[in-house]
Amino acid sequence: MDATRTFFGLPNVHNVPLCLTSNLSLFPQRLLQKHTLPLKPAKKHHLVCVRSTKSSDDLEGSRPSTYFSPSLWGDHFLSVSLDRGEFDELEREIETMKPLVKDMLMSSQSSDKEKIRLIHLLVSLGSSYHFDKEIQDILKHSFTKLDDIIVGEDDLETISIMFEVFRLYGHKMSCDAFDRFRGEDGRFKESLAKDVRGMLQLFEVAHLGTPSEDIMDEASSFAQNHLDSWIGGNVSGATPHLLKHIQNSLYIPRYCNIEVLVAREYISYYEQEEGHNKILLKFAKLNFNFCQFHYIQELKTLTKWWKDLDLASKLPYIRDRLVESHLGGLGPYFEPHYSLGRIIVAKIIMTMVVVDDTYDAHATVPEVAVLTECLQRLNIGADDKLPDYLRTVLESVFEVMGEIEQEMRPKGRSYGVKQVLERFKNVAKADKQLTEWARTGDVPSFDEYMKVGLVTAGMDGYAGYCFIGMEDVSEKEAFEWLSSNPLIIQALNVMFRLANDVGTYETEINRGEVANGLNCYMKQYGVTKEEASQELRKIYSNNKKVVMEEFMNSHDHVPRQVLLRCLNFARLFDVMYTEGDGYSEPKGKIEHFMTSLYVHPIPLS
């Protein structure tokens, strides 16, 4: 128990600091919340318990009353026409321009700093994957002489960019490099506030810290305070497009956002930059539109598949979130060559959502027991007494996973499907326990809840979904690494569990699911909801730092492409749970994100 508490970063029960905010978001209140939304007076929320006059048999036999809003998209993508000629032209232009960009990157006339700045720009524009090998070679060589490169460098933006690029590619550049920007009192110098771009870059890289690097927390607070004060003000050297870029970064910092959304916003910003490189800008626009073609084709394929399954009408209690599930595949990898992977991830996510919603939102306790037993066997027995809807659920799981296995077998990648199903068995057993708590109104301790909740987080399964379609990595080696229960996966489980529990708190409590992490924390420590949410944010933040540390420390024995998926999972959580549960209720910010990725191409002129 003590080891568990240490890993979660749990506070002393008698020393829980107060939090006066009424906002339940897992993340600090961002600019848009501070400047555009009126804050309601803080109210104290206490532990929610369910008391019922029903017998235990009645409670176990009760069916929850749950409503999810309909799909925002329906069959929209079936009616979207794609011009194959336009697609081919985009591909030709990209291939024509790639040598030009590569020549810039490999130029012998460029210094190490200039090359690293160019790499940073390519990453920001979403184009770096075209030159991944070249970039890794450049950075591997540059990192060996890092001390010589940064000696005497006193530009905050330059140091911050180098810090970001090296860490993103697995080289742990020391945060001691920022000591040059601190005064004798150990604090960051106030004179830095004049450097708008440097402060913005410092704020972004502050999210790449590890658990032992307190200086990065100081950098984040210092930079954010100054950036906040500039919004709405008249800062010398800050143009309107730069202020808008700052506003976007404060709302969702780069490393709390998925790569393709970062690129979409940065392209618009870079186009307005004076002296931008026209070749790089055009290449980035072509690349984004080329990627978007893939996404739309994937969604056309997925929409037809989902329509043919007809589960949304057969099982009206489930969340009809196909496009949001595709976003769940786009977060881990946005590149065109992972198109098959995204389709597989979206299919499995939707299949798992069907099962999850059956546990959470529809099945009775006896039905849950039968469902769990069938999932352990991975078949429906002749003696199983199943209601029709439950048979539909199970048949859909077996059918979808069977089709994926059959599709991947000729590619020599069916091993992963079996591994994912084995992991899913564990999730099903844990879901059964959560359902029993929910139906009986039991609120376990936070420690007891997390033992089960971390299993239902299922990040080893999510990673497995992604590995199935990654033909550039050894499937067996990737799953063997997963089976070692790496620390990065453990930390991701904590992050997802807490993000989901805070984001879905109101919804779950309203339908009687009192076994929620936030509620359980309130019970164990005798604190209010506001105090509990503050502590869960700290635990979330600590585990995100663990993810970053393990990402860098594992590059010597785990393929970079595997580790990137894990880093990108953490970024996806931040997007999905910025404002509540963006997957279940996407209306608003998530809808806007999806529209920018799936509907509107970038004008080329």
Curated annotation (Swiss-Prot):
Which keywords has UniProt assigned to this entry?
Cytoplasm, Lyase, Magnesium, Manganese, Metal-binding
Q: What are the transmembrane regions?
A: none
Q: Which cofactor does it need?
A: Mg(2+); Mn(2+)
Annotated tissue distribution: Predominantly expressed in flowers and siliques but also in roots and leaves.
A Gene Ontology cellular-component term: cytoplasm
Q: Which domain of life is it from?
A: Eukaryota
Cofactor note (record) = Binds 3 Mg(2+) or Mn(2+) ions per subunit.
Question: Pfam families from the entry?
Answer: Terpene_synth, Terpene_synth_C
Query: What EC identifiers does the entry list?
Result: 4.2.3.-
What is said about the domains?
The Asp-Asp-Xaa-Xaa-Asp/Glu (DDXXD/E) motif is important for the catalytic activity, presumably through binding to Mg(2+).
Listed name of the protein: Terpenoid synthase 18
Q: Which organism is it from?
A: Arabidopsis thaliana
